[in-house]
Amino acid sequence: MRSMAKKGLEEVLETLDRIIHDETVPRNVRRVASEIKEKLTTTDEVSLEAASAISVLEDISADPNLPMHVRTMIWNLTSQLERISVE
């Protein structure tokens, strides 16, 4: 993996950690973030898992119970994952 993609992945994992440990985030969203993190860290096909994660994140960003700051974090995650899936 290229260094730019590796750095991008590290940023994604940090953001996922913040979502997972934020008590204001609904439990189902924290669970999904945890699953995405696990898939990204255990696969050899990071670009494929990044594309899959984008789809899931777009679905949960529409959750009406999601705090606005978390929705913004999810949109930023999606943007970062798009860069990883292309590389």
Swiss-Prot record:
Matching InterPro entries: Ta0600-like_sf, UPF0147
A Pfam family recorded for this sequence: UPF0147
Cysteine disulfide partners in this protein: none
Family from the record: Belongs to the UPF0147 family.
HAMAP family (alphabetical): UPF0147 (MF_00342)
Protein name (record): UPF0147 protein AF_2370.1
Species this chain originates from: Archaeoglobus fulgidus (strain ATCC 49558 / DSM 4304 / JCM 9628 / NBRC 100126 / VC-16)
